[in-house]
């Protein structure tokens, strides 16, 4: 009996020793692991945070530069008669609309945002359908005169306008090396001052009409478009020629290179949008062949950039609403490259040529 009792005691002692050994080993390993933790763990955590912050800054830097800030856009009606060439300020715009007017001519509406442009023009009179695009850009609207329909619509639509007929220097002035009515000039600075004096808001939270891309858009599925010819009428056509080095298009009108009045540099653009919409003679009792633009609805078009073109749809639901430009194949809103854009609105029958 005594021997069994001793065996039991020794068994318990052995078990206790084994457990103590296991526990001691665990404590030793935990201590050693703690001692082996690198002293720069905190530094690594800080480095990760710095990388994340840099990535965030990089994302900010990728935001488009052409349309930013809360400066309210200023839309200026620009004369496009050959007697007005060369025009001033077009290379400083973020957006230009070119649309038919009477006599087969076109007129331009140039939009500036946060730009200090000393000479802009020649400024010409308003046509009512340009107001649709001033409204969708939430722009202050500058012009020199107006058609009867434009005058009526400016009033009824509550357009914040600046009419050169009612202003002298320094807001508008005439230059001596062009003949009237192709010689009225202005500047963004004097227009902004006049707008403030009239109590117009000069800041805007409105988003861009165009969906600017953060990364360069390459239309890999598009057709070749290194030269694009757009006939607006029997009288007027424009051609854009692509420069693969600058990745921009140079503008020609009626076969003539278009240059800037102030700098002599060629007029260029990063993006071109073509929209096909019919026009017809406006029955306004004047017999002056003034036009009406049928631009409410969904229309075919093209988006052109970096030497390629894709088919798009252009949808405008009302005069005030933004035009939505979508890929004709996918239905998705197109991404437009960071840079200025010319929107050419021409008749549905126009035969645009690509080379």
Residue ranges and their predicted role:
Residues 1-2, 23:
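Short alpha-helical segments used as structural interaction elements across diverse proteins
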Residues 2-16:
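N-terminal Sec-pathway targeting helices
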Residues 6, 35-97, 102-355:
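A surface/extracellular/periplasmic glyco- and lipid-processing/surface-interacting theme
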Residues 18-20:
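Core subunits and conserved enzymes of cellular information-processing
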Residues 23-36:
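Hydrophobic single-pass membrane-insertion segments
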């Amino acid at each position: 009996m005594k021997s069994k009792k001793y065996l039991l005691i020794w068994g318990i002692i052995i078990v206790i020793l084994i457990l103590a050994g296991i526990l001691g080993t665990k404590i030793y390993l935990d201590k050693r692991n703690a001692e082996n933790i690198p002293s720069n763990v905190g530094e690594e955590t800080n480095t990760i945070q710095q990388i994340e912050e840099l990535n965030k800054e990089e994302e900010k830097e990728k935001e488009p530069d052409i349309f930013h800030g809360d400066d309210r856009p200023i839309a200026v009606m620009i004369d496009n008669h050959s007697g007005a060439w060369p025009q001033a300020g077009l290379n400083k715009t973020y957006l230009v609309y070119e649309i038919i007017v009477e006599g087969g001519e076109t007129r331009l509406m140039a939009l500036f945002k946060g730009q200090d442009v000393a000479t802009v023009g020649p400024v010409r009179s308003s046509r009512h359908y340009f107001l649709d695009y001033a409204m969708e850009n939430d722009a202050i609207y500058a012009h020199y005169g107006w058609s009867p329909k434009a005058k009526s619509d400016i009033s009824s639509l509550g357009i914040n306008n600046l009419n050169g007929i009612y202003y002298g220097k320094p807001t508008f002035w005439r230059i001596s090396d062009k003949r009237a009515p192709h010689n009225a000039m202005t500047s963004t600075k004097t227009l902004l001052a006049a707008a403030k004096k009239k109590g117009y808001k000069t800041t805007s939270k409105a988003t861009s009409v165009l969906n600017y891309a953060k990364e360069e858009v390459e239309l890999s599925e598009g057709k070749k478009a290194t030269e694009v010819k757009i006939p607006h009428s029997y009288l007027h056509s424009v051609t854009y020629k692509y420069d693969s080095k600058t990745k921009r298009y140079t503008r020609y009108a009626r076969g003539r290179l278009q240059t800037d009045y102030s700098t002599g540099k060629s007029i260029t653009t990063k993006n071109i949008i073509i929209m096909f919409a019919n026009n017809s003679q406006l029955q306004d009792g004047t017999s002056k062949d003034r036009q009406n633009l049928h631009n409410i609805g969904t229309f075919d078009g093209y988006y052109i950039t970096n030497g390629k073109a894709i088919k798009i749809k252009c949808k405008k639901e009302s005069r005030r609403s933004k035009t939505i430009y979508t890929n004709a194949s996918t239905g998705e809103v197109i991404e437009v490259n960071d840079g200025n854009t010319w929107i050419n609105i021409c008749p549905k029958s126009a035969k645009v040529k690509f080379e």
